[in-house]
Structure formats: C-alpha cells, structure tokens
Amino acid sequence: MVLQMIKDMNLNLKVMQGVYIEAEMNNFGCPWGKVYSENELKNNRHQNLVKVKKLIKLANSYPDVIFSLSAGNEATVDWTDHYVSPEKVIEYVKLLKEGTRQPVTFCENYVPWHHKLEALANELDFLSIHTYPVWEYKHINEALEYTKQNYYGVANKYPGKPVMITEAGWATNANGKGIDPGNVSEDFQERYYHELHKWCEKENILTFFFEAFDEPWKGSPDANEPEKHWGVFYENRAPKRVMKPYF
C-alpha cells in the first residue's frame, strides 16, 4: 500500500486521500453516461458509505501522511456520469468530520460552486476546484488568465474559505473531439505548467497538476483520445518535455 510505503520509508510526501463516490441518481443530462437500474443505484449508495467508512479508518491509521480528505470527485457537476446530490455529499462530509481530525473538502469543477454548492461549501474546511482551459476551447495564450478567472470567481464568492486547485493541466494529444488538436502539444503543456506554477507560488495557492502519468485506458479506443494524454510522463514512465530537465 502506498500510504504504508510512505510511512515506512519516511518519505517527504503528503496525501490528499479521497473516495470516488458512484452514481446515486441517474443524470440524464450526461451525454456519455449509462442509465442505472434502481438496484444498481441502491448498491452504489451502499458501497459509497462503505468507502467513506474505509476512508475514516485510513485517515486515522495514517494521520502523519494524509493531510486532508475529499468526500468525492466531480459528482455534482451537470455533465457527470456518477451524480450524487449535494445533500448526500454533505452527509458524507459530516461523517468524515465526525470521525477524523484532518480537514475535509470536496473536489469539483469550478462551475457548480457558483450556483448549487453553497450549503456544501459551508460544511467544508476548504474548497477544491478543477480548471481546464483547454477543454473550454481556450488557446494557450489565454489559458492562465482563464484559470485565474475560474479560481478568483470561486474564491471571491466564498471569502472565508481557503480554495485550492485539485486539478489543472494541459493535454499533449487530441483527436478533435472536445479539444482542438492544434491546441495541444508537449510545448503547450510545458508552458501552462510553468505559468501556472509561477502564479500559484506567488499567490500561495496549493495546486495539484493533472497529471503524473498518461492513462491509456481512459476514453474511447482511439489512440488520440485526449483523456489518455494528460500525463507529464508517458505510461512507460519516460518524461515528457516539461519533466525532462529534472531527469
């Protein structure tokens, strides 16, 4: 287990540990999601609770490694294929806060924080947003400014809450479905990475860059599917351009 290895080897690493909560409701607004039977949804609700309880155990077993907890990931945004109501997420958040000492968050696209997650935000210790300018057809030249708009839009709405970026990145390949192939490359990824890092360091914004390694299992069978190409390393662990200076 990764957490045990970090502890045993005394590695200078901290982890945000989260649960991936599955669909508890059908989201007919998701263009790629399936329609779940009531039995499937019932089972998902049960398994989600099991996952939350397991997270509580992990948090208490590795208090020096796990620095924060997330009650889910992209489960309330309009296009999600694993929809869970904000009210149910609040229940999971309360369970985590009652059973652990670590601060609790929920990782979500920046949009829902503006219009449907106010009650959830009040329960969280800090907010976590995802921002992907390239998915919203922004050119690399306007990418950082768009990220700033996404961030400050949420931060200014909740002035009493710390806000971190738990996903931000730039793909290195695309097939034209959702992302213009001319707007992705290792050069563009490198530029966005460094511009984002410089800004976040200046503003003291904790950020997770998405992501470490390519995930070829994601998305469609098309080898150029953009979901497969967000890593700063290839699947075989070879560094892409942005990481080559460090290896």
Predicted segments with their positions:
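Aromatic-rich peripheral "rim/lid" segments of glycoside hydrolase catalytic domains that contact
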Residues: 181-188, 199-247
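Aromatic- and acid-rich polysaccharide-binding/catalytic face
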Residues: 13, 17-19, 23, 28, ...
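Loop/turn elements at helix/coil->beta-strand transitions in domains of secreted/extracellular proteins
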Residues: 10-14, 63-68, 99-104, 122-125, ...
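Active-site clefts of carbohydrate-active enzymes
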Residues: 77, 81, 129-135, 157-189, ...
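Charged helix-capping and loop-helix junction motifs
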Residues: 52, 85-90, 142-149, 189
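Aromatic-lined carbohydrate-recognition surfaces of secreted/lumenal glycan-active proteins
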Residues: 19, 71-73, 93-114, 160-171, ...
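Alpha-helical scaffolding within the catalytic cores
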Residues: 1-2, 50-57, 107-119, 148-152
